[in-house]
Amino acid sequence: MATLPVPHGVEAGKTGSTDPLRDAAGRALDEKALIVEATARGLTEERRDAVRRKSLADDPWWYHPYAHLAATTGIGIGVLAASIVGMTRLPDPVRATDLLVIPGVALFANYFEWRVHRDILHKRSWPFEIMYDKHTAMHHMVYVEEDMPLRRVEEFRLVLIPAAGVLGIVLATAPLALALAYFWSATAGWLFLLTASLFMVSYELLHLAYHAPTDSAVGRMRIIAKLRTHHARHHDPRIMQRYNFNVTVPLFDWLMGTMAPKRNTP
């Protein structure tokens, strides 16, 4: 049997190159090899389990899945709590115009989620190569549409954002909140942080829920089952580079024309 092409990110037990000087041909191969392999029916359960075992073996000795979950959600919940406390201490009442921040931030966050997923997690680009390697060449190799659930809690590391990444998002958005507080109102600044942190926690918990066993209490929830179907379609390697990039609510998939077509559509 001919040897199938494989993503650089998983070949020979490696988790991926992060060399920013890789040529265009190498990048293109990374982005297409998994699709080619899956189409050729080479993405077997044994093949995926080998990547799963390798990724778990690479976990540092200090890694604990529940500590990871507590850290990522804890940062978001901490910012959320600080925002609520900050708002309660403001002397002025909340104005109706301040509330416009909530839908505005939610809309931008949904777009940001869609754009990062499409253009960073599925396209190798400097300086985000490691994010591509962890997502396309690992997460998508382990979890496919017909086999989404985690096998063990140690696999949280394959699904959750690193705690440092969540902290980085908070630090990156803080200047925007300060700008709103200065140019609009202090309430608007706090509402920005509140909405952004709530969205971030929702992203983490929803993504983890999609990869929970379907017969679990979480997996059986109707809303989770509905949203999981959208995300699971994205885990078909043949279409993962083109469709269903939203993880929370597929608003920008709908707006940008990246909703996966129905299966009976040619």
Where in the sequence are the language-model features?
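Membrane-anchoring/interfacial helices and their immediately flanking loops
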Residues: 2, 9-26, 81-126
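Acidic-enriched, low-complexity/disordered segments with a strong bias for Aspartate over Glutamate
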Residues: 19, 23, 30, 42, ...
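Proline-rich intrinsically disordered, low-complexity coils
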Residues: 5-7, 17-20, 42, 60, ...
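A generic signature of intrinsically disordered, low-complexity regions enriched in glycine/proline
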Residues: 12-17, 23, 27, 34, ...
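Short low-complexity stretches enriched in small and charged residues
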Residues: 30-37, 96, 186-189, 208-210
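Membrane-embedded catalytic scaffold of the fatty acid hydroxylase/desaturase
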Residues: 111-266
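Transit-peptide-like, low-complexity N-terminal presequences
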Residues: 1-66, 264-265
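Long, highly hydrophobic alpha-helical transmembrane signal-anchor segments
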Residues: 58-113, 165-194
